[in-house]
Curated annotation (Swiss-Prot):
Organism the protein comes from: Isothrix bistriata (Yellow-crowned brush-tailed rat)
Gene of this entry: MT-CYB
Keyword Membrane tagged: yes
Keyword terms, alphabetized: Electron transport, Heme, Iron, Membrane, Metal-binding, Mitochondrion, Mitochondrion inner membrane, Respiratory chain, Transmembrane, Transmembrane helix, Transport, Ubiquinone
Source superkingdom: Eukaryota
Protein name: Cytochrome b
Residues that coordinate or bind heme b b566: H97, H196
Length: 379
């Protein structure tokens, strides 16, 4: 009799994806982040569901409902902070996952990569709308500033902004619709993750060497399931340390003040994981130019498969490209720092230089270094 996991229509799909999946024998810990992101997504959906049971999407009661969750609901503080810090951990892993894809040339799986970029945009949108829900000062003003950016779109901009707001300012209608979208998007993201995996399993995983590994595959379980559990332990350690010791470390103190349309906070800034894009937005004096640069700072990821000119897939054996990638990482850290600083000298000029460097490294220097490496190897 055939084993049930190989014959049952449903269990067979799980088997082919997580148990008998042929996996390269040499993939490193950098390949752990995919499964960790899946766990993060599940954790966010579960904690979010419990928060939604106690939350009210109304301008008068949203702030106090969140306070009620922390004070009166059993372990409500734990659920809320696990959800807030879970988002931070989610983004840390997302950025590491993307960085791994760039370093090892995984973007050559074009469908998987492009769906991944769409996933990134969806997760960013979900996180932004989630930040608005507690209805603190930074929630309100963050929503006002970011939605206002759409008014830079020629001809239809102002109408579009009012349509998104559901009125003439960020108000009850905005909060209600943001809650609805924030609730539904993670489930759409889950469906997209399945498509992401479907395309990945069409080609099989990449590996650190960037070479074809069809001749050397091992089953996913038990080898990589155990390896992923180790990564999961580290993730839980990081998350629980944040939640239990310093839950407000990554938050903004202004968000503990209820939203007040008559009082603007001195520095409006998003959560830390959007600061690099926010710095690029602010570094361009023109509104439409800033919005375009903001969009391009993420959408530029879609150009990676087109701009790959190296004869080698991975950067493992390309020292020039490695140096440039780590320069890009340093540049992104500088942008993140600048995004959290006030708009004054010398931060303005540092932000502008870092923004120019960001696009130059990706669009000019990386393809040039790949071309030079090809020449040096006489390819």
């Amino acid at each position: 009799m055939t084993n049930m996991r190989k014959s049952h229509p449903l269990i067979k799909m799980v088997n082919h994806s997580f148990i008998d999946l042929p996996t390269p024998s040499n993939i490193s810990a950098w390949w752990n982040f995919g499964s960790l992101l899946g766990v993060c997504l599940m954790l966010q959906i579960i904690t979010g569901l419990f928060l939604a049971m106690h939350y009210t999407a109304d301008t008068l009661t949203a702030f106090s409902s969140x306070t009620h969750i922390c004070r009166d609901v059993n372990y409500g503080w734990l659920i809320r902070y696990a959800h807030a810090n879970g988002a931070s951990v989610f983004f840390i892993f997302l950025y590491l996952h993307i960085g791994r894809g760039i370093y090892y040339g995984s973007y050559q799986f074009k469908e998987t990569w492009n769906i991944g970029v769409i996933l990134l945009l969806m997760v960013m949108g979900t996180a932004f709308m989630g930040y608005v829900l507690p209805w603190g000062q930074m929630s309100f003003w963050g929503a006002t500033v970011i939605t206002n950016l759409l008014s830079a779109i020629p001809y239809m901009g102002p109408t579009l902004v009012e349509w998104i707001w559901g009125g003439f300012s960020v108000d009850k209608a905005t909060l209600t619709r943001f809650f609805a979208f924030h609730f539904i998007l993670p489930f759409i993201i889950t469906a997209m993750v399945m498509i992401h995996l479907l395309f990945l399993h069409e080609t099989g995983s990449n590996n650190p060497s960037g070479l074809n590994s069809d001749s050397d595959k091992i089953p996913f379980h038990p080898y990589y399931s155990i390896k992923d559990i180790l990564g999961l332990m580290f993730m839980l350690l990081l998350l629980l340390t944040l939640v239990l010791f310093s839950p407000d470390l990554l938050g903004d103190p202004d968000n503990y003040t209820p939203a007040n349309p008559l009082n603007t906070p001195p520095h409006i800034k998003p959560e830390w994981y959007f600061l690099f894009a926010y710095a690029i937005l602010r570094s361009i004096p023109n509104k439409l130019g800033g919005v375009l640069a903001l969009a391009l700072s993420i959408l530029i990821l879609m150009l990676f498969p087109i701009m790959h000119v190296s004869k080698q897939r991975s950067m493992s054996f390309r020292p020039f490209s490695q140096c440039l990638l780590w320069t890009l990482v340093a540049n992104l850290i500088i942008l993140t720092w600048i995004g959290g600083q006030p708009v004054e000298h010398p931060f303005i000029i540092i932000g502008q230089l870092a923004s120019i460097s960001y696009f130059c490294i990706i669009l000019i220097l990386m393809p040039t270094s790949s071309f030079m490496e090809n020449k040096m190897l006489k390819w």
